[in-house]
Amino acid sequence: MLKNDRLLRALRRDTVDRTPIWLMRQAGRYLPEYRAARQHAGSFLKMAKTPELACEITLQPLRRFPLDAAILFSDILMIPDAMGLELHFIEGEGPRLGKPIRDAAAITQLAVPDMETELRYVMDAVRLIRKELDNSVPLIGFSGSPWTLACYMIEGGSSKEYARIKAMAFNAPDVLHQLLNTVTDAVISYLAAQRAAGAQALQVFDTWGGILSPTMYRTFSLPYLTRIARELERGTGTEHTPLVLFGKGNGPYIAELAMSGTEAVGVDWTIELEDAARRSNGQVALQGNLDPATLYGTPNNIAREVQRTLDSYAAGNGGSREGHVFNLGHGMTPGMNPDHVSALVEAVQRLSRR
């Protein structure tokens, strides 16, 4: 039995003694111990593909901060890599795929990876982390969204314009839907395998959904998020594994996401939580949404923004703070001060106490 199940209870909108907190990219380059591990390992991929290293990095922030969850150390591009697109990282530039998708013929050759062979290192990491956590806090598994993964698979890496995938959306939408359906199958299998290996909550990162127009979002992102929420087996009762759909720029679609079948919606800092709570109409829990740049402020300013965020959620949720998981609106960045993270966690724990 979990010693700290605040996250899972909040995701079910049950009563908690205070608002739970975890942070996207809580294991990352802002921590000196992460930088030391990265230097010792020699590459990001070695860390991500070695279960013992992935476990160590997952646990690093838990040793520093009294967080309410661990999140698997990995990368959303492990699925495309396992599909044969050859993931590698270029220093200062980020991820690159050596064999990007350029036409329909390449899509027909894609297959859903076998999770216990091509992605066994991920599942072994999940099993090892669960063992090391010893039921102290829940472990979150994750995947990129179909749209976000397709962006990388077609562009070959990060992009400012996403011209190739947008051209495909306009000129060959059937081809893009074929890719998105295959990727959705892979995401569902991947999340199910993480759950079977021991993940106790799951999150989908729709990082690039916000680059789409409303019509395009409702065509190329939302239907596939909904399919994941409705088709991913998550169990019942005490064996239930809640799902969070997080997206940058998803504010206009919260009402629709709330009806997708997910347990929670994660939002960025470009919408007030009060508005998000009203739009979700009590159908889902909400996760977020402090602007990550707040952590560049003083501890007093951080505490002030924590209070404002907590109050904003309650104002849109009938005065109640239940059903809220405190998080940033996006991930931690390398230049952040770990002491300010401590101040953030302390402020959330103190100010959200029921």
UniProtKB/Swiss-Prot annotation:
Q: Where in the cell is it found?
A: Cytoplasm
Instruction: Give its E.C. classification number.
Output: 4.1.1.37
Chief location: cytoplasm
Per UniProt, which keywords does this protein have? Cytoplasm, Decarboxylase, Lyase, Porphyrin biosynthesis
Which parts of the sequence bind substrate?
R25, Q26, A27, G28, R29, F44, D75, Y152, T207, H330
Self-association and partners: Homodimer.
- Give the similarity note: Belongs to the uroporphyrinogen decarboxylase family.
Q: Can you name this protein?
A: Uroporphyrinogen decarboxylase
Look up and give the organism this protein is from.
Xylella fastidiosa (strain Temecula1 / ATCC 700964)
